[in-house]
Swiss-Prot record:
Residues 42-74 form a coiled coil. Belongs to the SMIM15 family. It is a single-pass membrane protein. This is Small integral membrane protein 15.
Length: 74
C-alpha cells in the first residue's frame, strides 16, 4: 500500500533541494486545470447571459400581451 508519510517526506525534501524544479512541476501540473476552469467559467457566464436575455424577452412579451388585452377591453 502507498505510504503517504514517506511520499510526503520525499516531496518536502524535493521541494527543499530543488525549489525551482518543484515549482515548475507544480505550475505545469496545474496549468491545464486553470485553463479548464477559465473555459468553464466563460461558458457559464455566456449561459447566464443567454438565460437572462431570454427571461427579459419573455417578460417583454408578457407585458405586451397584457397591454394588448387591456386595450382590447377598452
Amino acid at each position: 500500500m502507498l505510504d503517504i508519510k514517506a511520499w510526503a517526506e520525499y516531496v518536502v525534501e524535493w521541494a527543499a533541494k530543488d525549489p525551482y524544479g518543484f515549482l515548475t512541476t507544480v505550475i505545469l501540473a496545474l496549468t491545464p486545470l486553470f485553463l479548464a476552469s477559465a473555459v468553464l467559467s466563460w461558458k457559464l457566464a455566456k449561459m447566464i447571459e443567454a438565460r437572462e436575455k431570454e427571461q427579459k424577452k419573455k417578460q417583454k412579451r408578457q407585458e405586451n400581451i397584457a397591454k394588448a388585452k387591456r386595450l382590447k377591453k377598452d
